[in-house]
């Protein structure tokens, strides 16, 4: 049977990190990036220096997450396409991660409000319908610090 520390090392190795290079605090920090995969509607923002693997886990580690890059999205793409009557990314993925969070914008003027409502309650309104989804939202971005 594995000890707690051995389990932590296994989890970190499964994401491509070598635990021997990290102290205990850093290991726990790296593990917190994975909370969104096991906890519904967990929302978090991680800021850090470039090239530290902030978005790697959401793009490469799990088939149940999607990384939205490029900064711009639509309410139809993210939440609900009313013309197709189809739920968007929050209904299809366990984790929706936004890369370069500083550049996020919506083409729709009500996009930010719908996102805030979803993050607070796990549901959103489109037309006459109230729709629930369990996706977690992660926001990752760079800071200008070495």
Predicted regions and their residues:
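AAA+/P-loop NTPase substrate/partner-engagement loops
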Residues: 56, 60-108
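Charged, amphipathic alpha-helical linker segments immediately N-terminal to NTP-binding catalytic cores
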Residues: 1-24
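Pre-Walker A (Motif I) flank of P-loop NTPase domains
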Residues: 40-44
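Structural recognition of the conserved hydrophobic beta-strand(s) that form the central parallel beta-sheet
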Residues: 97-99, 117, 133-146
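Conserved ATPase-coupling elements of RecA-like P-loop NTPase cores
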Residues: 22-25, 104-112, 126
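Pre-Walker A adenine-sensing motif
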Residues: 18-37
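Conserved glycine(s) of the Walker
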Residues: 51-54
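Conserved Walker
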Residues: 85-86, 120-136
């Amino acid at each position: 049977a594995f000890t707690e520390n051995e389990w932590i090392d296994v989890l970190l190795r499964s994401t491509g990190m070598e635990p021997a290079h990290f102290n205990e605090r850093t290991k726990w920090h790296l593990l917190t990036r994975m909370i969104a995969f096991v906890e519904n509607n967990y929302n978090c923002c991680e800021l850090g220096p470039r090239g530290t693997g902030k978005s790697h886990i959401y793009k490469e580690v799990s088939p149940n997450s999607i990384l939205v890059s490029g900064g711009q999205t639509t309410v139809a793409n993210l939440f609900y396409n009313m013309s197709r009557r189809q739920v968007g990314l929050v209904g299809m993925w366990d984790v929706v991660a936004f890369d370069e969070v500083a550049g996020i914008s919506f083409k729709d003027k009500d996009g930010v409000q719908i996102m805030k409502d979803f993050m607070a309650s796990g549901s959103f309104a489109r037309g006459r319908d109230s729709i629930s989804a369990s996706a977690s939202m992660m926001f990752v971005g760079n800071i200008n610090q070495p």
